[in-house]
Design a protein with these regions (language model features):
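Alpha-helical transmission elements in cytosolic ATPase-linked domains
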Residues: 3, 50, 59-62
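N-terminal flexible/basic segments that precede or flank functional cores
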Residues: 1-15, 75-83
Length: 83
């Protein structure tokens, strides 16, 4: 399997779970290694990569910050809700 460049990964950012998993694998880290480097528990990282929807934003940002990213608002292609 050919390794993807970081640029290719960035161009195809999908769910945060897939994004983190792809970057971790690109660096050749195990989940345990990345969790330790980011200062989060292995259980949290596993849940993040599995797409659990009830994770703490601060901890997700702690992992994303390791790669130079953070969560933030993204404009969606739909009509805004009534004010």
């Amino acid at each position: 399997m050919a390794r993807r460049t970081l640029e290719e990964i960035y161009e195809n950012i999908g769910p945060v779970s897939a994004f983190v998993r792809q970057l971790r694998k690109q660096l050749g880290y195990t989940q345990e290694q990345l969790a330790e480097r980011c200062g989060v528990g292995i259980r949290f990282l596993k849940e993040l990569e599995l797409g659990k929807t009830t994770l703490r934003f601060d901890k997700v940002n702690q992992v994303l910050a390791y790669f130079g990213f953070q969560l933030g608002p993204i404009k969606m292609e739909r009509q805004p809700l009534d004010e």
